[in-house]
Amino acid sequence: MPTSGAPSNLDRANAQLSNTSSTESSSSNNSSTASGSRHVKIESNRVSLPPLKIQKGSFPAIRQPTESSTHFQSSHSVSNAHNQSPLNQSQSSANPVTFEIADEPSPSFNHSFFEKDNARDIPQQPSHSQNPSSSSSSSSSQSSQHSTHLQFQIPSNEKKSLDDPSPRRKPSFFSKSNLKRKYRYLKNPDAWNLPPSLQFIPKNLNRKGLKPVIRAAINSWIAFLLVLARHTNRVLGMSSFFVVITSILVPAMEPIAPMLWKTLFQFLLLFSAYAWTVLAAKLATVARGSPSREASLAQAVSEGFVCPDPSQGFNYCIREAVFQGYFVRPLPSIIWALFEFSAVALFIRLKMKYPPLNFPCVFSIICTAVSANMGPMYPYFYPRIGLFFIVPNCVQTGITIGCTLFILPETCNHAYNTMLCKLTEDTSSFLKRQTEMLSHSPASSHWASFSSLENEIANLKNLLSKMKSTELFLDMEFSYGRLKGEDLVSIQRIFKKTILRLSAFSYFQRLIDHNMQIYDDETIQKAGEATVSSWLNTPALSAASARTSSGRNSSESDRVSYFGLAPVNATTQDSERNGEEIRRLASKQLNVPVNNNFRTVGYASPSNASTASFNDIVQRGRSHVRTGSNNSEAPLAAKTSTTKRNGDLLEPQSPSLRSHKSRLHLPSSLGKFYKKRKKSYKPVGVLEAQQYLALESRLPFNKPQFLDSLLSILKNSSGDLFDQAIYSLDALNAWLVELNHDRIKKIFSKRDQKAAGRDRLKLIKLHYDHLSQALHEYEREKCFDVRKPYESLFQNQDVQQFYMHSLRSLFVVYYYESHLMQAVRGILQILETVIDLEERRPIRRLWWPLRSIRRSLLSQLTGHQGDYDENIHNDVDKDMNQSSTQPRDPDADHPSSLYHICGYRLTKFFKSIFRPMNVFVLKVGTLAVICTIPAFCRSSAGWYYRNRGLWAVILAIMSLQRFTADTVYGYLMRIFGTFFGAILGMVIWYTGSGHGLGNAYGLAAVWGAAIPFIQFIRVHFVILTPMPAVIFCVTAALTVTYSWKSNHEPGVVTLGIGWDVAYRRFLTVAAGITVAFIFSFLPQPRTAKYAVRKNIGNTLIDIGSIHCEISNFARRPVHNHIDPDIQSKVLNLSNTIQSLIGRLNMVNFEPSFKGRWPMEKYQLLCKTQLELVDLLNSLMTTITTLEDRWLFALLYRVGWLDHKFVADQLAVLYMSSNALQTGNPLPQVVPSPLVDRFFTTSGDVFLPPGLNDAPVPIPKAMEYELLNNMQYLNFAVGCTIAYAVVNHIDRIMFITKSLCGEIFEIDKWPFHFDDEYLYTCHPTNSPDQRKSPHDLV
C-alpha cells in the first residue's frame, strides 16, 4: 500500500477520532486488522482529541500536524514516495497515527458530525526512524501505545481473483456510474476544448449558473403566452410585443432584494418620463389652440385629406389622418423637440452616473422617444401615447417579480453565502496550485505554466468586488437562517486581507521565473569573470556615483560606492569581451523593460528602425566605455563605422542603407514620404540605462545559489502547513454550504439545532487547533530549514575574498515564507470569526430589515458606529491619515467676502456645464432630436412611422458612446448581433408556423424549447460587455413576436411576417447605429486612448497617496494591526487597474490614423502598477510583524526616513502621472533611477548600520545564526519588498518616457566619459569611502 493518506473531498468519508484507554485501542486495532482493513500511517504527537465522525458531504478530514517534515501524501500533493528528496527521506516519523480504510462509505449526508456510539479506537503505534516507503508495510505490525489516531473509511478497490465465479463486468455506456463519470468530466471547462469566447458554457453548467436561467426562461415563456392569447394581446395594446422584449432586457436572474429595488427605481423613472411627456403633449395642444377631434378632422379634410373608407366611421378616419401626418405643425414639433432633448439628456446623465440604473434609464428613454415620435401627429390632447410602452412594461415587471419570488427564489443572504463558498473553493485551489508549483524545478518548463496564478488572484479580487454590490442589500430583505448579513460581511472582510496577502505568491513565481531567464550557464561564467576582474582593477569612483548629489544626504553622497566600470587599463581583447557579456545582460538583471518597450532609432538599417530593442541601445550607448580614455568624445552610435547626420536622425552607412540610396532621387514629395515612413523616434532612457549598467557591473553577478534545493526544502517544510490550511478551508467551505442548506431542516426542533451546533463548533475548533499548531511549529523551526544549504558557505572564509555569495535566493524564499505565514494567520482569523458566530448563532431565526434600518438611523443620530465597525481596529493616531494638504487656485486667493463666494459658486457651476461628461450628455440629446426630425416634418412623418423609424431613434441614442472606441465596438457588435438574432428569429418563426401566418401551439412549443438557450446566452455571454448578447436575444424575440402581432392584432401599419420583419429590423438598426457612428466624430471625437492614458496617470497619483499613507502608518506608535482603510484603498485601486487592463482590449476597436497604438506598453505599465500596489500592501503587512527597533532599522535602511529619497520616489510618480495626463515629454535627467541610491548606504544590504544605541543591539555583520531570527527574516523581507518598490517606480518612469518622450537634452553628460573625469572630480578616495565587495548582495 503506498503512503497515501489524506483523501480528497470527493473520496473522503467517515473519518473518526478517538482517545480511549490503551487496552480498548489495542482490541479495536486487532479487530480492524483482522477484518482486512488497510492501514496507512502518518506521524503525530498531538494530544488526545474527542471522537469524531465525518460523513460524506460534510466537513473534510482533519490532518494531524507534525513537528518534523512528514511524507504525508495528499490528494492535492503532486509528489510521491518514489520521488522524495534524500533530505526528506532521511527524516523520521514520530508517534505515527493509523488511518483505517474500510470497505463501505457512508451513503448519505448527515449533519450530525459527532456520533460517539459508532466511534472505534485504534491504538497509536511506536515511532521508528524509517523511510516513507517502509512506513506502510510496517504500520500494521507495530505495537500499540496511548495516542491519538484518525480513521478514514474508503471503499475498497481490490481486484478480484482470477478464479472468481462472477467476474467484474465492464459497465455499459448508459450505466449510472459511467454517466456520472462523463458528467464530471464535462463539468471541467478544459475538457470542452472551446475558444475563450465560449468558455462560459461549461463554466455555468452547474446549479448556480442554471438557476437564474431557468427562472428567466419561465419568465419569458409566460410573457410570450400573453402575446399569443388574443384577449391579453388586445389589452396590452399596439405595443404588446414589448412584454417579451422587457423579459429579455431585464431577466429574472437576480436575488429578491436587488430586483425589488431596481423595480422601484424603474417605476419611479418610467412614470417621471411619462409625466414629462404628458406635460409636453399639453403644451403642444395649447400651442395649437386646443382644437377638438371633430374640428381637427374638418380642418384636415379642408386641406385635402380623403378618408380611405368613410364607411368605417369617424374614429377610423381621424386615425388615418393622424398617422399620415396631416396634423404635424412646426410649433408643436419644436415643443416636443425641446422636451425630448431635455429628457434624453437627463436620463443619459443618470445612466452614466449610476450604472445599476442602466435599464430603468433605458426604459425611460424609450418612453420619451415613443412619445416624441408620435406626439406631433395628434392635433388634440392625447396623454395615452406613453402608455403604449408603459402598460406592457409594467405587466412584465410584475411577472418578473412573481418569478423572482416563487420560482427558485434566492435571497441576498443566500447569494452572498454562495459567493463566499466560491471564494473559499478558489482560495483552496490556489493553495493546492502552490504545492504543485513548489514540486517543480524552476529550470523546468512546467514552472512557466504557473504564470496563471496572476489571473487566479485577479479572479479572486473581482469576486470580492462583485460581493460588494450584493453587500448593500444584505440587511434590506427578510431572510431566515442562522447568520445575518453583517455576520457574513465580517467573514468577507478577513477574506479580503487574506487574498491580498496571497497576491505575493504570484509575484514570487514571476520573480523566480525572471531570475531563471536572465541566468544561463554560458554567460554566467564569462560575466562572473568580468565582474571579479572589474572589482580588482577599478581604483576610482565612477562618474555616475559622483553625480548622485541628490542622494540620501550630503555625507552619504561623499562616500558613495564605486560602480566598477571597465578597468582603466582594460585594453585587451579578453577584458573587452568580458565587459560585453556584462552589458549584454545588464538590462535584464534588474528587470529593465526590453524588446520594443522603448521607441528607438534603428542603426543597422532603415527597415529595422522601429524594431531596435532597448538592449541594443544600451550596448551602443555603453560602447565608448570599452575604449577607455582615448575615446571619451565618442558619439552614441560609435559602434558603427561611419555615420551620416540627416536632420535629427543618425543614419549609419551600412550596405543595406546604401542599397536604398537610389530611392532618395525620387521626386521630393515621394522622397519625403519615404523618409518619413522609415523615420522613427529617438532613443529614450539612455542615461538611466547606463546607470543601471554601471550598477550591474558593480553588483555580484552570480547565479542564484541553491535555488532548486531551497524550493525543495521549502516544499517539504511547508507541506504540513499547506495541508492543514487546505483542510481548514475545505472545512470552512463545508460549514458555509451547510449554513446555506440548513435553513428549513428540523425547523421546529431547537434541541436538534443546538446539538448540531455543538458538533459543528467542536469540529471547527479542532481544525483551528491543528492549523494553529502547524503554524506554531513552522514559525518556530521549520521556516528556518531553508538556511541549511548556506551553512558550508559561512564556514568557508576563502569565499569572501572577492564577494560574499549572493543570498538573493534565500531572501526570495523568506519573502514567500513570510507571506505564507501571514496568509495562514488570515485563515486562522476566519476560523476564529466562525467559532464566535457559531457560539452566538446556534439557532435559526428570521432576520427582518427594519431593525437594521432603525439601528442605522440611530447610529447616525448618536454618532456611534453600527455592527459593521465593531471589528475594525480603532487606532489612537487615526487622525494622522487626515490630509493636511490641499490644492489651491493659482489665479485667486481664498474667498473673503459674499461677493467672492457667489462668484466662486457661479464659476464652478458654469465650469461643470462644460465638463466632458456633460458635453457628451448634450450631444446625445442633440442626436435624439436630429434622428426624430423626420417625425417633426409633415411630409415625412407618415413614412417615418410606417417604416418604424422609432427603432432607429432608440438604437442611435443607445449606440452613441462617450468614446470613439466604444462607439465602434457597439457598431460592430450591434451589426453582428442583429444579423444573427434575425436569423434565429426567422428559424423559430418558420419552425413553429411553417408557411402559415402563425400557429399558437407550434410557436409556444418552439419558443419554450428555444428560450432556455436564449436566456442562457443573455445571462452568461459577455464579450467585454453584455451588450452583444442583449442585442442578439432582443432581435430574435422581436422578429417572432412582431410577426405574430402583425397578423393577429394588426395596427395601422403591418410590416409582415418572418423575413419582412427581420430585414426591416436589420435596416433600421443599421441606420440608427450608422448615424451614431458618424455623429461620434462630430465636432471633435473623444478617443478612448486619451481616456485610458489619463486614467492610468490618475492611478499613479493614487499610488503615491498609498505610498504616503503606508509611510505614515510605519511611523505610528502602534502599528501591530493593518489599517483597514488603507487596505480597502489598495483593493479598490487594484480593481481599478484591473479594469483598465480589460479596457485596453476595447481601445483596439478605435482606429489609429497617426500610427500603431502601443498597446503592449500600456499593458506593461498597468501590470507594473498592479505589482507595485501589491508590493506596497505587502510592505504594510510586513511592518506589522516587526518590533520597534527592527522597524526603525528597516525604515532607516531602505531610506524611508530620508525625506530626500522619499521625495524622489514621489517626484517620479508625479512626473510620470503628469506626463501621461497631459501628453507632455519628460526631462532627460530625472530623479530616476532610484535603485542605485538604494545601495549607497554603508554596511550590508540587508543589515542596518549604526544602531548600537538601540535597547538591544542589532548585529552589524552577517552571521549564520542571524538567519535563524524571525525578526531578521521579516526585516530581510521588508528590504526585499522595498527594493522591489523602488525598482517598479523606476520601471514606471522608463515606460512613461517610452510613451511620452524626453526634452531638455544634456549633452556630454559626465557619466558618459571615461575614468579621467573621476580623477578630475575625485582625485583621492579613502578606503572607508568605498564599499567592499563582501558588503554587496
UniProtKB/Swiss-Prot annotation:
It is found in: Membrane. The lineage of its organism: Eukaryota, Fungi, Dikarya, Ascomycota, Taphrinomycotina. Disulfide bonds: none annotated. Pfam families: ArAE_2_N, BRE4, FUSC_2. Residues 157-167, 868-880 have a biased composition (Basic and acidic residues). This is Uncharacterized protein C57A7.05. Residues 1-94, 119-174, 623-662, 868-894 are annotated as: Disordered. Residues 80-94, 626-644 have a biased composition (Polar residues). GO terms for cellular component: endoplasmic reticulum; membrane. Keywords: Membrane, Transmembrane, Transmembrane helix. It is a multi-pass membrane protein. The chain crosses the membrane at residues 209-229, 241-261, 267-287, 328-348, 361-381, 387-407, 917-937, 975-995, 997-1017, 1021-1041, 1066-1086, 1275-1295. InterPro entries: ArAE_2_N, BRE4-related_DUF2421, Memb_transporter_dom.
